[in-house]
From Swiss-Prot:
Residue pairs linked by disulfide bridges in the UniProt entry: none
Pfam families: Mur_ligase, Mur_ligase_C, Mur_ligase_M
EC identifiers of the protein: 6.3.2.8
UniProt binding sites for ATP: G108, A109, H110, G111, K112, T113, S114
Protein name from the UniProt record: UDP-N-acetylmuramate--L-alanine ligase
Family: Belongs to the MurCDEF family.
UniProt-listed SUPFAM superfamilies: MurCD N-terminal domain, MurD-like peptide ligases, catalytic domain, MurD-like peptide ligases, peptide-binding domain
Listed GO CC annotations: cytoplasm
Length: 437
């Protein structure tokens, strides 16, 4: 048994990885800021100790896992080096972990977490699968056959991984503090393609993914008949979305997903493709798909009188558009109210006009102050720059949360990657209910 200490344990990936090592029988603890982060709930439920940052947390005999947001000058990292302990970056450590399994990486600018969550749930319907999801959820199942994990392209960290399979959901320009342009992003994915050992499953409508070169087969999925794996005869029902799946032009089977929106059908197709290639029992896969309950912070719903409150991680214009589309398809007779907190000044600056366009698809828009990050907490623009671009939009804060009372028979989307949950929590307290995120 190894004693692991995670520096930045409340990070989504770090939280998941800490849970996996705990499940596999190791002693696990970690440190982070004292401010509430939704990932700490799962850690506490497993009895994993969360400490405030302090050099005294580091003891002889530990293996220290260093979160990617924390520099080598961090007091705990300095202490670990002074004690000559093994200090391993998150992505490097995860790369070692996955080598013990048949691994499936899920990567792409958007849809990674939702697809990884679906993949782990569906695969466990047929084969024992450990998993690491970017919503802070992780599970290490002893004697697992498979390992499903989220692989982020930021700073090319995913190049530390050599998975058996890779699902690539899309390529888009994001993380403008690191990537220069879309071609820079595409080059990172091209490099990742050469790391894959068995096959790549890629979205067929993405021009950049269509240009990939790889040493393994690439199977394209989507809603078009020229895709290797495609959905047809799509029907929206009160139980979700039903569709037929074709593989290489031949009918495979009919599936039902409890989710709505084209992007969720595409996620399901990617997962079905993996199960098909690994010759899993299709009936087990169908049953598991029908029982998928979603992942944390991805269209998580709470009902309050005639309102549906939705907690969603959407923080890029395309993700916002997809979340609004899902709300409209699931609740066609309700108004859509967007409450959005931009995440990082560089992303807000880079996509200012795109944010305005995507948010304008909602019936009403409220905006929060820009949320900075550990790496970047100031910028030249303000939230007023975005408000000025969206007709009828307004600033919302905890002290004026009651403006949402006026929207009867509405879906209120609380979107963002920062601490937007505090506004939903404030609104729920205002209307007399409480909910732990």
């Amino acid at each position: 048994m190894t004693h692991y200490h995670f520096v930045g344990i409340k990070g989504a990936g770090m939280s998941s990885l800490a849970q996996i090592m705990h499940d596999l029988g190791h002693e696990v603890q970690g440190s982070d800021i004292e401010k509430y982060v939704f990932t700490e709930v799962a850690l506490k439920n497993k009895g994993i100790k969360i400490l405030p940052f302090n050099a005294d947390n580091i003891k002889e005999g530990m293996v220290v896992i260093q979160g990617n947001a924390f520099p080598d000058t961090h007091e705990e990292i300095v202490k670990a080096h002074d004690l000559k302990l093994d200090v391993i970056r998150y992505h490097d450590f995860l790369g070692h972990v996955i080598d013990q399994y048949t691994s499936v990486a899920v990567t792409g600018a958007h849809g990674k977490t939702s697809t990884t969550g679906l993949l782990s749930h569906v695969m466990n319907g047929d084969k024992k699968t450990s998993f690491l999801i970017g919503d802070g959820t992780g599970m290490g199942l002893p004697a697992s056959d498979y390992f499903a994990f989220e692989a982020c392209e930021y700073r090319r960290h995913f190049l530390s991984y050599h998975p058996d399979y890779a699902i690539m959901t899309n390529i888009d320009f994001d993380h403008p503090d690191y990537f220069k342009d879309i071609d820079d992003v595409a080059s990172a994915f091209q490099s990742m393609a050469h790391n894959v050992k068995k096959a790549i499953i890629a979205w067929g409508d993405d021009d950049h993914l269509r240009q990939l070169k790889a040493d393994v087969p690439i199977y394209y999925y989507g809603l078009n008949k020229n895709d290797d794996i495609y959905a047809d005869n799509i029907q929206i029902t009160d139980k979700g979305t039903q569709f037929d799946v074709y593989v290489n032009g031949e009918y495979y089977d009919q599936f039902l997903s409890p989710q709505y929106g084209d992007h969720n059908i595409q996620n399901a197709l990617a997962v079905i493709a993996i199960s098909y290639l690994e010759k899993m029992d299709v009936n087990n896969i169908k049953e598991a798909l029908e029982t998928f309950g979603g992942v944390k912070r991805r269209f998580n719903e709470t009902n309050v009188a005639n309102q549906v409150l939705v907690d969603d991680y959407a923080h890029h214009p395309r993700e916002i558009s997809a979340t609004i589309e899902t709300a409209r398809k699931k609740y066609p007779n309700k108004d859509i109210v967007a409450v959005f907190q931009p995440h990082t000044f560089s992303r807000t600056q880079a996509f200012l006009d795109e944010f305005a366009t995507s948010l304008s698809k909602a019936d009403h828009v409220y905006l929060c102050e820009i949320f900075g990050s550990i790496r970047e907490n100031t910028g030249d623009l303000t939230i007023q720059d975005l408000i000025n671009r969206i007709d009828g939009s307004a600033l919302i804060e905890e002290n004026n949360i009651d403006v949402l009372d006026q929207f009867d028979n509405a879906v209120i989307l609380f979107m963002g990657a920062g601490d937007i949950q505090k506004l939903q929590r404030a609104y729920e307290e205002h209307v007399g209910m409480t909910n732990e995120f």
